[in-house]
Amino acid sequence: MHTWARVGACGAALTVVMTPVTAVEMTRAAAEAGTIVVLDSDLRRCDFSLISTDPMVAHPGLGTGTAVISHSGSSATAEVHLVDAPEPGTHFDVGLIQEPRPSSATCGPGDPGTAYSGFDTDAAGSGTVTIKEGIRPGTTGVWVIVERANPNSQNPAEFYTSEFVAPVSPS
């Protein structure tokens, strides 16, 4: 009987010691894994404000996507996934945009606080790209825009943006 009591006491002591270690490791793993952000078919301004009157687009946003946003040291990374089955073989431009930024600032390719890349969807309509950018001083978060060019307009033919600004802070 006393043997089982000692085993139980040792097990309880081990649990008390291991719980904080496990919690720290789980938190560290979550930070390294990044923040999962859903991509919505919403058009946004460069300051992340929503454009309430979307431009007429050739095709509605029929795709679905996510971005895994992480930061390490002084850089932010976005791994962007999009599935647009109705439009296989389509090229999309993808931007990683740092916030805050003034509403008057532009956020196209080459603008400060932005990084752009692109991908072509495969035969199933899937595409993935990873973008990495140095975090500028004062940056508190980043968001992603995915857009397909419209040959007949300056407005994109199809677009997806982050549901929220993912927090980052330079180390």
Predicted segments, located by residue:
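Secretory targeting and sorting signals
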Residues: 1-30
